[in-house]
Design a protein with these regions (language model features):
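Conserved Radical SAM active-site core
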Residues: 2-9, 21-24, 33-104
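A short beta-strand-turn-helix
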Residues: 10-15
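Conserved AdoMet/S-adenosylmethionine-binding subsite of the radical SAM
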Residues: 72-189
Length: 189
């Protein structure tokens, strides 16, 4: 059984697949504790492979985004094979601290300050920028695309982020690209 926080249908809001219709399977639980995490781990539903495949198949999109939390704590070859059997294209958003099962079609590593990265290759690297040394990620992880994402916080009831700082960094380091959380800008899931 898998602990699933939610399954929903929307547009991918981040990275290279921004704007692509996708079914999101958000797994509960994580091996890290990041202050900017937007996932509620307190509630989840236990689901079988068949339950997940059925829920995902209710939507027309081929892209399925396995996210969390940290999906590598739960995603296994059995689930990957079952989703491929119904012609789904699987993307995973991982912190890169755990091995992934074979068969994932698109890997996004979103490294965190508190975890030791073991994955060395990805389709993209997406870093939430909090002023840290991000160049080390380009040395540690081979990927065709590297994205910086502003860190959003709510202070005194007002949403703020470090967007200007991120833009300055990218302009000075043009191998990085900007990734905004467009789903939040558009006020969609």
């Amino acid at each position: 059984m898998y602990r699933v926080n939610e399954i929903f249908y929307s547009l991918q809001g981040e990275g290279a697949n921004t704007g692509t219709p996708a079914v999101f399977v958000r797994f509960s639980g994580c091996n890290l504790s990041c202050f900017f995490c937007d996932t509620d781990f307190s509630s989840y539903t236990e689901m079988s492979v068949e339950d997940i495949v059925s829920a995902v198949s209710a939507y027309p999109a081929r892209l399925v985004v396995l996210t969390g939390g940290e999906p590598s704590l739960q995603v296994d070859r059995k689930l990957v094979d079952a989703l491929h059997a119904v012609n789904k294209y699987l993307a995973i958003e991982t912190n890169g601290t755990r091995p992934l099962p074979e068969g994932i079609d698109f890997v996004t590593i979103s490294p965190k300050e508190t975890g030791k990265i073991i994955l060395q290759e990805a389709d993209e690297v997406k870093v939430v920028y909090i002023g840290q040394d991000v160049e080390r990620y380009t040395a540690w992880i081979s990927a065709p695309r590297y994205f910086l994402q502003p860190c959003s916080e709510v202070k005194n009831g007002v949403q703020t982020d470090n967007r200007e700082e991120v833009i300055r960094y990218i302009l000075n380091h043009p191998h990085w690209r900007l990734s905004l959380q467009t789903h939040k800008i558009l006020n969609i899931r």
